[in-house]
Amino acid sequence: MVDNGSTDATQDELRRIAAASGVTITIVMEGRPGLAFARNAGMQRARGRVLVFIDDDCEVGRPYLGDLQRHYAKGDRVVRGGRVELGNPGDLPFTVKRSPVPEVFTPGVHPGGFVLGCNMTMQSEVAARIGRFDERFGAGAPLQSAEDTDYLVRAYALGIPVEYVPDMTVYHHHGRRERAEIERLHRSYSLGNGALCLKHLVKAPWLVKHFFWTVRSAMAETLFGPRFDPDLQLSHWPIVLMNLTGAARFARLWLAGRAMPTELPEVGEAVSRLERGP
């Protein structure tokens, strides 16, 4: 469990949980705020053959570990995500993945949401090859989101399959019940995705196609075409605007000297000799 700079009694609560648990729990303190920092801290100290990333507002379904063991029985070298359901039916149906059929990623679909970061798995050898999460992305970072999508794009560029399976379920208690909250999150996701377009312009130019397809859909929406999400009344236009904003923000970060190498080889080397937690 990673405590990502909490200022309340989280550390004491984690210690209580660890002491009462029937399995070994390693508590990792990561003072730098940001989801990507937390993911990297956990990944660096993980001991298992298979890494499982979930979020702090998610509950793992009872069959999860059995599903996980079955899917990795053959030692697949993939990035694999599972179903994400609402943890509370009162929350709005956003940041969920309910497809009932298995899927394999291709550039014909946008990678955002194909596998959600709150339910993403891979073998440690795969993580070693891809490297660390880009800490400029994700909640609490300048680019606000898309650290998981960036990871999928990097995996695909390396020839690592990205798969979705309709089991391996987690329940997401995101707590958002007002449309305004979903609109803010929608814009945040779009900002991160715009940054990805510029970051991967050379290695994944197909991302730009999705931007132009969104522009086309936005123009059609103006002429009484369908919205991006009719049920939640989410428009294509904020996606266009925030994609451009995200690309501009990424450019500023790069020009300011904060760019990180995509492969991050020093982390890939570190995963093979994982640091043991306290």
Report each predicted region and the residues it spans.
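Short, flexible, basic/aromatic active-site loop/helix in glycosyltransferases
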Residues: 82, 96-114
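A short, conserved alpha-helix in the catalytic core of glycosyltransferases
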Residues: 115-131, 136-168
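Glycine-rich, basic loop-to-helix element that forms the pyrophosphate-binding segment
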Residues: 30-46
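Short beta-strand/loop segment that forms part of the nucleotide-sugar
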Residues: 1-5, 26-30
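Non-catalytic, C-terminal membrane-associated alpha-helical segments of glycosyltransferases
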Residues: 184-191, 198, 202-278
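Short aromatic/hydrophobic "clamp" motif used to bind/position activated sugar donors
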Residues: 51
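A conserved acidic beta->alpha catalytic loop
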Residues: 3-12, 58
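Conserved donor NDP-sugar-binding/catalytic core segment of glycosyltransferases
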Residues: 63-94
